[in-house]
Amino acid sequence: VPETDPTTRKDHSNGTSEQPPLVSIVLPTYNGSKYLREAIESCLGQTYQAWELILVDDCSSDETPDIIAEYCRRDRRVRSIRHEVNKKLPQALNTGHAAARGDYLTWTSDDNRYRPAAIEEMTRFLQEHPAVGVVYADCVLIDDTGRYMRDFPALPASRLAYVDALGACFLYRRSVYETLGGYDVELFLAEDYEYWLRAYREFELAPLHKVLYEYRWHTGSLTKSANRRAIRTNAERALRRHLPYLRRSLPQDRARGWTVCAANAVRRGDLVQAATAYATALRTAPGPSLSYVARKLVERLQPRRAGSEMLPNGEWS
């Protein structure tokens, strides 16, 4: 069956045609064979059927290529692309998005799972809310065996000024991708956060308070503490780049973002940059800035919940 030419497909993202909008799901993977089947099966098991799954193999050396080939044979909606050298997550995302034909786009990880109605619920939301560019949903945290650990509700988009408020379950219109372009390959492990900051400057982002996604917390997670410094560094780079322009965020949220930057500057010994960031926070919202710093000082004296910064909606400090 010949593939549809993406340049000739009509945009049905506003629900103006009887043909259901096509949803493109990009799934990048690198040596992810342990949980890859579960991730793919959660896509195949969606109640919404008008989707394509683009598997991007970032030069895996385990059983990942065999698993991908198996699913490409099983379902013609599944396609695959392989990098001949490892290019890391942001470039794998860009490779998948460049091949996507959908009216709506999303991506998922090789160790996480969609709930069965995830794509249907988010697609319906975008169809019913034409002014919204990105919808994002509640998640739950699961362990390496798939057991429930705790909830991760979607946060107000205004909080992007200091935290990745969107979490790991989202859907956006093709117009968002066409406006923003690809993910920043220089911000590995914070590429999604920077993308949402860009999106928030241009589009309406709306939470959908239904649990539609299972985020797995395990020893092989990219967001485990071994990558903590890289995540914090790149997230701060993204935040400093966009924070001055987040006029839609509440003043107290922008102030908190500047205090996060100040705290990270202190951690790396850059007291001049810390003072500048904190002064900006005080100018933006004096009261919340002072109370936030006091609370963070108290937290520093208490045991930290393991990995809390690295989870969906985790704060970058």
Q: Which sequence ranges carry the predicted segments?
A:
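Conserved donor NDP-sugar-binding/catalytic core segment of glycosyltransferases
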Residues: 117-149
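C-terminal subregions of glycosyltransferases and related glycan-biosynthesis enzymes
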Residues: 2-20, 194, 201, 217-317
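Glycine-rich, basic loop-to-helix element that forms the pyrophosphate-binding segment
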Residues: 83-100, 110
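A conserved acidic beta->alpha catalytic loop
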Residues: 49, 57-66, 85, 109
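Short, acidic, metal-binding catalytic loop of nucleotide-sugar glycosyltransferases
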Residues: 41-50
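Acidic helix N-cap motif at the loop->helix transition within catalytic regions
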Residues: 35-37, 62-70, 117
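Short aromatic/hydrophobic "clamp" motif used to bind/position activated sugar donors
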Residues: 105
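Conserved nucleotide-sugar donor-binding catalytic segment
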Residues: 98, 137, 152-235
